[in-house]
């Protein structure tokens, strides 16, 4: 039973590597936007209402 578990884990890992590489180009824009939001939060932008509405997707 443990051998079957290991085979499933290894197969899943091997299959996920090529799909991760193929999706890097498509996810580049999403990753950039996410990192921009994190930067705004760390700078305190999302705690001020005008900035939060524009960049953080929240309304007060």
UniProtKB/Swiss-Prot annotation:
Database matches in Pfam families: Toxin_8
Post-translational modification: The native globular disulfide connectivity of this toxin displays multiple conformations in solution. In contrast, the non-native ribbon isomer has a well-defined conformation. This ribbon isomer is inactive on alpha-3-beta-2 (CHRNA3-CHRNB2) and alpha-3-beta-4 (CHRNA3-CHRNB4)nAChR. Post-translational modification of Pro-49 into hydroxyproline [P49O] induces a 2800-fold decrease in inhibition of alpha-6/alpha-3-beta-2-beta-3 (CHRNA6/CHRNA3-CHRNB2-CHRNB3) and 6-fold decrease in inhibition of alpha-6/alpha-3-beta-4 (CHRNA6/CHRNA3-CHRNB4).
Modified residues (Cysteine amide): 56
GO cellular component terms attached to this protein's record: extracellular region; host cell postsynaptic membrane
Principal place of residence: secreted
Signal peptide: 1-16
A molecular function (GO) term: toxin activity
Reported effect, residue 55 to A: 150-fold decrease in inhibition of alpha-6/alpha-3-beta-2-beta-3 (CHRNA6/CHRNA3-CHRNB2-CHRNB3) nAChR. 21-fold decrease in inhibition of alpha-6/alpha-3-beta-4 (CHRNA6/CHRNA3-CHRNB4) nAChR
Pro-peptide region(s): 17-43
UniProt superkingdom: Eukaryota
Annotated compartments: Secreted
Disulfide bonds: 45-51, 46-56
The record's note on its domains: The cysteine framework is I (CC-C-C). Alpha4/4 pattern.
Known function: Alpha-conotoxins bind to the nicotinic acetylcholine receptors (nAChR) and inhibit them. This peptide potently blocks numerous mammalian nAChR subtypes: alpha-6/alpha-3-beta-2 (CHRNA6/CHRNA3-CHRNB2) (IC(50)=0.258 nM) > alpha-6/alpha-3-beta-4 (CHRNA6/CHRNA3-CHRNB4) (IC(50)=1.54 nM) > alpha-3-beta-2 (CHRNA3-CHRNB2) (IC(50)=5.72 nM) > alpha-3-beta-4 (CHRNA3-CHRNB4)(IC(50)=27.7 nM) > alpha-4-beta-4 (CHRNA4-CHRNB4) (IC(50)=69.9 nM) > alpha-2-beta-4 (CHRNA2-CHRNB4) (IC(50)=121 nM) > alpha-7 (CHRNA7) (IC(50)=272 nM) > alpha-2-beta-2 (CHRNA2-CHRNB2) (IC(50)=800 nM).
Note: Negative results: does not inhibit alpha-4-beta-2 (CHRNA4-CHRNB2) nAChR (IC(50)=10.400 uM or >20 uM).
Name of the molecule in the record: Alpha-conotoxin BuIA
Annotated organism of origin: Conus bullatus (Bubble cone)
Species classification: Eukaryota, Metazoa, Spiralia, Lophotrochozoa, Mollusca
